[in-house]
Structure formats: C-alpha cells, structure tokens
C-alpha cells in the first residue's frame, strides 16, 4: 500500500478563484481522513507562507514539482490544461511518475482546454499521449474536458469526471459593511467572473441586462466580483449610468464571497467559457437561484441563457425574479463531490473502507440559508 502522504500542486489562495479554493478544500478533506498533505503553490507571485511550499523562480518551481513527492506519496497536480505553461507543469508531473515511480494524479479544470487541444497537430497529439500516459488517474472538471482528453488517444489512462466542488462546510455572515451594501439593493444580483482569458467580458453582459431591468425594478442592484476584475468593469458602470445600481468589489476572500452569495436573490454566471464554476454550485447549495450562460456544461438546477445575449439574460432574470422568494432545501440538487473524491483516493491508497487505519472524517454540516 502507498504511504499516507499527498502532495497537492496547484494555485492556492489567494487568489480566491475556483482552482485555488478547490485545492484548499481538498487538502482539508484529505487531512480529515488522516492523510498528511503538503501543498506546492504553483503561483510564482505567492508570498511565503507556512501553508505551502513555493518558489519565485520557474526552474525552482519545476524542480519542486519533480522532487517533492517520493515513491511512497501521491502527487496530485491541478492545472487548467489550456496553455503551454500548463502543459509544462503536466510534463514535469508526468516525469515524476515515469522516472521516480510516483503515483501521479492530474486534475484538469479549464473549459478552454477542449478548444486548446483541438488545435494540436499530429506531433503535438503524440507528445500529449506520451505525457499523459504515466498518470494513474486523470480527473476532469466536466464531461467535455474528459471527451477532449480521450480524443487525444490516451491509452491505459483512467479518466474520471469529478466536478471541483467539495461542498459548503459553513455559511459565513455578512460583515456590517456588506450588510449595509446588500440591503440597499432589492432585488440583489451577485455576479462572479472567472473561467476564461478575459474574466470581465461576461460582466459587461450582466451590466447591460441590469440596465434593461432597472425601469421595472428601480431598487435592483448588482455586486460584481472575481479575480482580476475591475479595470474594465468599473468604468463601464459609470458609462452605463449604473453607479446607483452596481458595485464592483474585484477579488474578495472566499468567506466574503460565500456570505454575499447567500445574501443574494439571484446569482449570475455570465462567462463565455467555463470548466466547472464552484460559485454556481455554492449558490445552489444555499438554495439561491442561479442564472448562467449556456457553456458546454452547467449543473442541474441552473436557469440557462444564451451566452453573450443581453436580452435573453434580462428575460431569464425577469422570470426568476418573478418567482416566490422562499428557499426550499429539499429541492437543492446534490453537488457535493467529497465522497467521489475520497473514493478515488481510497482506491489509490489500496484501502477499502479505510482498513489501513485512515479515519473517517466527521460529517459535514449542510449549508444553511
């Protein structure tokens, strides 16, 4: 049986985006099960921290990725898969599996991956197959990513679709400042950006839809947030005359994001591309209605609008806002993937029902409204 040590390699908060939050939550899940977890933060701009290993230099980071895990450990790389930089990381983790006998696991997060690998030529596809072969498991955030990986022609590599959502373990309260902000808007829309090369592109669609809805809902307001959000969005708010109806917070902590999601009347996800948006599932876990663009994949329980279509978004928001506001916990779709993720790890560890002495974690509390 493999040892009880895991090295998780990926971005780690901050920033508070989907992949970093997932890495943080996965580390906690594995520790709850009795595993020793080390984190390699692949963000070269990260500040030093006792929470993770890191390196400000590219070579130093690649060396740590190659050597931090030994043959008794599991190396689990989290990356987007839609850039050369990402595939360099995949290559190095692959080499750790190929030449150092490390159990290597790969999670691919990005909805941009299918389009990226579709552009591979014959040589690139052969190289990609060689790179992916040493991975014991490849986890994909949605089915379309999984189909793209299989289309490369990887032989002998087991793939799984496990959305990057491990539940909501607590329901943070609004700060006094955010409570005042949110109570000034009724109804309150919360829009979270991310998932693509220009995270602000979809927020422009939200703002223009809000502009159409204000005559009908004069107290309506929207709070916009996300990593790398602000430089384009704040000027657009002024340009559209929405200073009294929209606030751009930019990047916020995960707890602050959860509190705002929980307080909202509708959550909007307007990206043009997505892997699996954690915030969508978090909102659904709180019983908050979600209106989201029709990307390749959205979970059960979401109201879809045509991506980029301002009028369709306005129509769908109007429909949702016209519904009763009560939240019925029994109608929430089940999205928590903790059990699926632990089942995969238990298999990798060669342990059924944690017979090796690994503990069962305490049950997670359900997200409250």
Question: What does each model-identified segment do?
Answer:
Residues 234-252:
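Nucleotide-activated donor-binding/catalytic signature segment of Leloir-type glycosyltransferases, i.e.
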Residues 144-145, 152, 161-172, 192-196:
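Short beta-strand->alpha-helix junction loop in the catalytic core
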């Amino acid at each position: 049986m493999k040892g009880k040590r895991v090295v998780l390699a990926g971005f780690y908060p901050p920033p508070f985006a989907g992949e970093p939050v997932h890495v943080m939550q996965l580390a906690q899940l594995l520790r709850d099960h009795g595993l020793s977890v080390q984190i390699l933060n692949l963000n070269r701009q990260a500040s030093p921290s006792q929470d993770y290993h890191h390196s400000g230099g590219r070579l130093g980071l690649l060396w740590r990725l190659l050597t931090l895990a030994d043959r008794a450990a599991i190396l689990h790389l989290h990356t987007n898969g839609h850039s050369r930089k990402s595939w360099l990381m995949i290559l190095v983790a692959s080499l750790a599996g190929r030449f150092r006998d490390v159990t290597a696991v790969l999670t691919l997060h990005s909805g941009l991956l299918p389009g990226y690998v579709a552009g591979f030529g014959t040589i690139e596809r052969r190289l990609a197959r060689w790179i992916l072969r040493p991975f014991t498991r490849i986890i994909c955030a949605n089915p379309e990513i999984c189909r793209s990986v299989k289309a490369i022609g990887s032989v002998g590599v087991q793939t799984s679709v496990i959305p990057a959502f491990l539940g909501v373990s607590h329901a943070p309260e609004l700060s006094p400042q955010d409570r005042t902000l949110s109570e000034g808007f009724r109804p309150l829309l919360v829009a979270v950006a991310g998932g693509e090369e220009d995270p602000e592109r979809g927020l422009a669609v939200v703002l223009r839809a809000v502009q159409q809805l204000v005559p009908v809902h004069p107290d309506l307001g929207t709070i916009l947030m996300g990593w790398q959000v602000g430089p384009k969005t704040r000027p657009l708010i002024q340009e559209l005359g929405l200073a009294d109806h929209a606030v751009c917070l930019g990047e916020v902590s995960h707890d602050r994001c959860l509190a705002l999601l929980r307080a909202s009347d509708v959550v909007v996800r307007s990206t043009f591309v997505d892997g699996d948006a954690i915030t969508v599932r978090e909102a659904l876990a709180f019983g908050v209605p979600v209106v989201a663009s029709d990307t390749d994949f959205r979970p059960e329980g979401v109201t879809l609008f045509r991506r980029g279509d301002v009028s369709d978004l306005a129509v769908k928001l109007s429909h949702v806002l016209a519904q009763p506001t009560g939240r019925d916990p029994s109608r929430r779709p089940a999205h928590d993937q903790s059990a699926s993720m632990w089942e995969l790890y238990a298999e990798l560890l060669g342990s059924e029902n944690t017979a090796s002495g690994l503990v069962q974690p305490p049950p997670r509390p359900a997200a409250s409204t």
